[in-house]
């Protein structure tokens, strides 16, 4: 197993010539989707040189050959990408996006999933874990009975070194830069000297795994990337060429359940990359949502917030005729007695914190099967096959004449 470069101490490593730049840049683009144009040449050289010095290879020619070797290549490629990727992040990074998540997106998901009590969230390119842990802390506040829910927060990164740091849940001062982060630090961290140890209750909410976004291994059950309610991939695709970014965003679209949300960084590629999504403009944030239906008509109109769908579920226990009558009624959400989540969701709509699309708030026809099917898929994805079957059976019993079921 390669451990250290035998180059004698004090001697310089080989020069990084034009040929080296071209072949190594092609290699990392093909394997990891990472784009190193001429202006980033020094970054590529530094990363390659650091990984090379950790190998047993005498020169760049032999090192390049090892990277392409079927036996030793995977280990050396892992070491190389660990030196090439940047893990700069901190808790609740980008306050505008987290305001939108805390006041609108997450409360809407919670309302929508109240029946199944399952939520699936993916932090793609999570680096050292601050982002998925931030989401976990928000959910601790937003879901009063969280222990009765099945919440899956999945953090992935191509850099295994960062993932090990994330699993430890130990952070320094630089991870706390936002005002919201200091509030949660006092509640969910224990200070030990100059480090902050995350509370086990938050660490248990997040699982981590290695995933190369440039590969086509997702969405799949194998990678646990199906039926997501929310995907965050911020400041990751800025290192990809546009062609790779388009493929990644298309896979994210397929990984999301209908109505699921995508959060990307402000500097990501935007040349039509997100045209299949609904675009939602919030103060200091733009978020994307997969339409509830993949039809041209659905793509032309804004997707309603999930609170508007609550009245349809109020007819779940009614007879088919009563449920059908209920589906024709126009319902104002404000007339319903709000629980804490609904109040928080509505507060975001009325205090000027958020800018929502113009909506006609009506209940969804009770004969529409998409909601039940979507929830059943979510249950299946989280291992609750019996609950999924029971949910669909109840829907069929209530809608015996609907052939779509």
What is each PLM-predicted segment?
Residues 2-122:
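Conserved AdoMet
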Residues 124, 145-232, 236-244:
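Extended basic-aromatic, gly/pro-enriched interface segments that bind polyanionic ligands
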Residues 128-146:
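Conserved SAM-binding loop of SAM-dependent methyltransferases across substrates and taxa
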Residues 246-258:
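A short glycine-rich, Lys/Arg-flanked "PGG" loop and its adjoining helix->strand segment in the class I
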Residues 258-266:
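Conserved beta-strand signature within the Rossmann-like core of class I S-adenosyl-L-methionine
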Residues 278-328, 333:
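Core SAM-dependent methyltransferase catalytic element
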Residues 361-401:
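Alpha-helical segment of the N-proximal tetratricopeptide repeat
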């Amino acid at each position: 197993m390669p451990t250290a470069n035998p180059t004698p101490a004090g001697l310089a490593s080989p020069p990084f010539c034009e040929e080296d730049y071209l072949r190594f840049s092609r290699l990392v683009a093909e394997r990891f989707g990472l784009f190193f144009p001429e202006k980033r040449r020094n970054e590529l050289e530094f990363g390659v040189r650091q990984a090379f010095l950790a190998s047993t290879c005498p020169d760049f020619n032999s090192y390049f050959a090892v990277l392409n070797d079927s036996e030793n290549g995977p280990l050396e490629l892992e070491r190389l990408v660990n030196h090439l990727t940047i893990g700069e992040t901190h808790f609740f990074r980008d306050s505008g996006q987290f305001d939108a998540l805390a006041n609108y997106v997450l409360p809407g998901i919670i309302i929508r999933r109240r029946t199944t009590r399952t939520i699936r969230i993916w932090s793609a390119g999570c680096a050292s874990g601050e982002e998925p842990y931030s989401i976990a802390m928000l959910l601790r506040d937003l879901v009063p009975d969280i222990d009765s829910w099945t919440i899956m927060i999945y953090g992935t990164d191509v850099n295994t070194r960062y993932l090990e740091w994330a699993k430890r849940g130990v952070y320094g001062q630089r991870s706390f830069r936002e005002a919201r982060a200091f509030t949660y630090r006092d509640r969910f961290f224990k200070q030990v000297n100059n480090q902050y140890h995350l509370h086990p209750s938050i660490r248990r909410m997040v699982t981590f795994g290695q995933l190369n976004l440039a590969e086509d291994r997702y969405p799949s059950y194998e990678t646990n990337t199906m039926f997501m309610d929310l995907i965050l991939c911020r400041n990751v695709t800025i290192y990809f060429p546009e062609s790779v970014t388009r493929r990644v965003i298309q896979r994210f679209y397929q990984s999301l359940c209908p109505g699921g949300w995508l959060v990307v960084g402000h500097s990501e590629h935007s040349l039509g990359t997100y045209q299949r999504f609904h675009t939602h403009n919030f103060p200091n944030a733009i978020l994307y949502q997969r339409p509830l239906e993949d039809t041209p008509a659905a793509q032309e109109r804004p997707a309603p917030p999930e609170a508007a769908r609550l009245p349809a579920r109020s007819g779940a226990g009614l007879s088919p005729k009563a449920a059908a009558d209920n589906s024709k009624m126009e319902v104002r959400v404000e007339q319903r007695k709000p629980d804490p989540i609904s109040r928080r969701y509505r507060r975001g709509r009325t205090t000027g914190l958020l800018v929502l699309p113009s909506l006609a708030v009506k209940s969804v026809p009770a004969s529409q099967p998409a909601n039940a099917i979507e929830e059943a898929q979510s249950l299946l994805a989280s291992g609750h096959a019996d609950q999924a079957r029971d949910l669909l059976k109840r829907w069929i019993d209530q809608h015996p004449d609907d052939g779509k079921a």
